[in-house]
A protein has these predicted regions:
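Acidic, glycine-rich loop-and-beta core segments that form the ion-binding/anion-interacting portion
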Residues: 1-13
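Von Willebrand factor
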Residues: 9, 21-58, 100-102
Length: 138
């Protein structure tokens, strides 16, 4: 499990022992809300971790508003690699439930061709709908 904001952070061990380590995740909180380097973080993941974590059976879930502050093309490059190596790429975006939001007007548009399921994530029933979509695709 990885978190990213301005950089990528591997948090699998903290989540496995959540009772002891979950409070440690708060140390990353100061980078939240200060812009998201999605492309840079995903490229870092591809270079450092994809060989160990990505297979044709892997489902990748990204939860982000897609408001990327990386250079144009970075997110597309990384998602293209991730998509080649995995079975399903999901992107849950809390902005999709916002009236007037148009993903094609943001940098997320370069990611759309590589995403199998692009869904809203602003209400509990959004997650129920996503689970149905996953079952259809698997």
């Amino acid at each position: 499990t990885f978190l990213f904001s301005n950089s990528l952070t591997h948090v699998t061990s903290q989540l496995k022992t959540a009772e002891r380590h979950l409070p440690a995740l708060h140390m990353y909180e100061d980078t939240w809300g200060s812009g998201t380097c999605i492309g840079d973080s995903l490229n870092e993941f591809v270079k450092q971790y994809s060989h160990a974590y990505l297979t044709r059976n892997t489902v990748v879930l990204i939860m982000s508003d897609g408001l990327d502050t990386s250079e144009a093309g970075q997110m597309k490059e990384a998602l293209q690699e991730i998509k080649k190596k995995t079975s399903l790429l999901l992107w849950l975006n809390p902005l999709l439930g916002t009236p007037g939001y148009q993903p094609e007007r943001t940098r997320i548009k370069e990611a759309l061709p590589f995403i199998d399921i692009f869904a809203e994530a602003h209400r509990l029933d959004s997650y129920v709908q996503v689970s149905r979509e996953i079952n259809k695709q698997r």
